[in-house]
Amino acid sequence: MTIHQRTWHVLMILWAAVIMVVSVIPGADLPSLSIWEPDKVMHVFVYAVMTFLTFQWFKSFSSLDSLNKKAFISVTVCILYGFIIELIQLILPTRSFDLLDELANSIGCLLSLTGILVFSSKRK
């Protein structure tokens, strides 16, 4: 693995770890915000970043076919990661499964995918 690949890999793993830690801490320990559904906005943001980092890591490997394929794999991995975290929250006594959280996660992934595809097509 090159330094470039390793850098994206480490960033992706660290970001995924932060998401996991924040997702499993007791809900009562989370700061409360009074703005309209701010947690959903955060879900969109953190999963958009996760998708971008995952894409950058996959992009650093020339063995995968096309940028589009790398982008779609990145989105799939990140949506599944978000779903797995929601399932983990289902078994935690202080957390709960929230389908709207998973929807926000998926929207973040898809927004990132859109940005990746638009930016990639303009670079051609």
Language-model features: locations:
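Bulky hydrophobic segments
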Residues: 1-100, 106-124
